[in-house]
Design a protein with these regions (language model features):
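Short, charged/polar connector segments at secondary-structure boundaries
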Residues: 1-132
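An acidic, glycine-rich, mixed-charge low-complexity segment common to nucleic-acid enzymes
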Residues: 1-23, 34, 380-414
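Amphipathic, charge-rich alpha-helical segments that serve as recognition/docking helices
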Residues: 78-79, 132-215
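Structural motif corresponding to the C-terminal cap of alpha-helices
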Residues: 98, 182, 371-374
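Amphipathic alpha-helical "recognition" segments
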Residues: 129-136, 201-271, 278
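Charged, long alpha-helical assembly modules
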Residues: 236-330, 334
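Charged/polar low-complexity intrinsically disordered segments, enriched in acidic residues
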Residues: 306-391
């Protein structure tokens, strides 16, 4: 049985009851709690919150050795900066209509639900000085609940995934929380996590696979901070990469690690902006390719990897510095090199059942569509690519001509 909030606890937080209640589901049962107005000076942010804990991974040094007041100010600014337009809109709404939706706080004054509203009220207090902005309306949980981290998490999830305002919760924050709770700390089994967050198990499994691949990617680039995944917005790519790596793990396990390396390098080099689509095309073509074409492609990718690997393994460089160095690799364009390798595989698959004559005719028809007058107007990157491709074409045509000459010479001798 969950106890009512004690008078002693209410007094400790200087709260006073208002004519409002809030329902919470705790340990599978629904309870109705009174709501209290609590001075914001008695409340603090929850550093174990999913969104805040992701931010903390990259910014923990900012709050090291800081006072509670300073920590609150730093986290407030981080929450506000993440989506200023939405926060300003919420601030205007609270200023005009008051705080309509109460939050939830622990017995020690830590806010576990309502971080955005708490942030808006703190900022309104500072910028408007209105008396109403001195208080945050919230349920106060008793000490028994406040000391049980799994109970707290379940309450957070119940509120987080049910509320309309949480639909824009960043996917990387969700992904990190799932990975942290199920894989790292094992606080929840996947089934328990699904029950707490109301996620379909199939969706959670897909999400967890993407989270595991994201962690592997971060390890690969030497970055232990999930916040970076949010910064570069890789969630959608990792979702796609995880799906296709699953195919190789199940169907072609002997090249699984190599394909993972190739896809991670694609995420780094970005031969095309839509990495997810690019990975999808690669997998589809690789499935159809003949063994000699697969081996040639893997060899090309291994050569690209040999250029990337020393940079990625250089611990003296930040991730951004690694990217800059890869982009300017000895005047070569690794993105173009990777793009050409994948496009070649695609073309080989498309024409692998044609004989040499038909392939050459097909190439000639494509070349007829090329507008040579547009060459001077190409961007520098495309000019470099065109020059490399033209040189490769010349070499290939020369080899074909030599074979034709050999054939004609042999025919004449006979």
């Amino acid at each position: 049985m969950i106890k009512e909030t004690s008078r002693e606890l209410i007094t400790k937080l200087n709260g006073f009851e208002i004519n409002q209640t809030k329902d919470l589901v705790i340990r599978g049962q629904k309870y109705t709690f009174n709501v209290y107005r609590i001075p914001i000076s008695n409340l603090n942010y929850n550093v174990k919150n999913g969104r805040i804990s992701t931010w903390m991974q990259s910014n923990g040094e900012k709050i090291k050795d800081k006072s509670t007041t300073e920590i609150n100010n730093i986290i407030e600014e981080a929450i506000y900066s993440e989506n200023k337009d939405q926060m300003d809109k919420t601030m205007r709404d609270i200023e005009e209509n008051g705080q309509m939706i109460p939050g939830v706080v622990l017995s020690n004054g830590v806010v576990i639900d309502g971080n955005r509203r708490f942030t808006c009220i703190r900022r309104l207090k500072r910028f408007t000085g209105k008396i109403d902005s001195d208080y945050f309306n919230a349920v106060i949980l008793d000490e028994e609940i406040s000391k049980n981290e799994n109970d707290i998490k379940r309450i957070e999830y119940n509120l987080q995934f049910a509320a309309e305002e949480r639909k824009d919760y960043n996917p990387v924050d969700k992904m990190y929380d799932l990975y942290h709770q199920v894989i790292e700390t094992k606080n929840f089994t996947l089934d328990e996590y699904c029950a707490a967050t109301k996620m379909k198990k199939s969706d959670a499994e897909t999400f967890l696979e993407a989270a595991i691949v994201t962690k592997e990617f971060l390890d690969y680039i030497g970055c232990d901070k999930w916040d970076y995944a949010k910064k570069v917005n890789i969630h959608g790519h990792m979702d796609e990469i995880a799906k296709h790596l699953k195919y190789f793990k199940n169907k072609e396990p002997n090249i699984y690690e190599m394909m993972k390396l190739i896809m991670f390098n694609m995420e780094i080099v970005k031969p095309k902006k839509d990495v997810g689509k690019y990975v999808r095309n690669l997998t589809n073509n690789f499935k159809k390719a003949k063994e000699d074409s697969k081996e040639k492609f893997l060899q090309e990718q291994e050569e690209i990897n040999e250029k990337i690997k020393p940079i990625i393994n250089d611990d003296s460089l930040s991730y951004d510095e690694k990217i800059a160095k890869i982009e300017n690799y000895d005047d070569e364009d690794l993105a173009i090199e990777m793009y050409n390798s994948v496009q070649t595989l695609s073309y080989v698959v498309e024409t692998q059942d044609m004989n040499v004559s038909k392939k050459m005719d097909n190439i000639f028809q494509l070349l007829k569509e090329v507008d040579e007058d547009s060459v001077p107007f190409l961007p520098q990157r495309d000019l470099i690519s065109l020059k490399n491709t033209t040189r490769c074409l010349e070499d290939k045509i020369e080899r074909i001509k030599n074979k034709l000459n050999e054939y004609e010479k042999d025919s004449n001798q006979h």
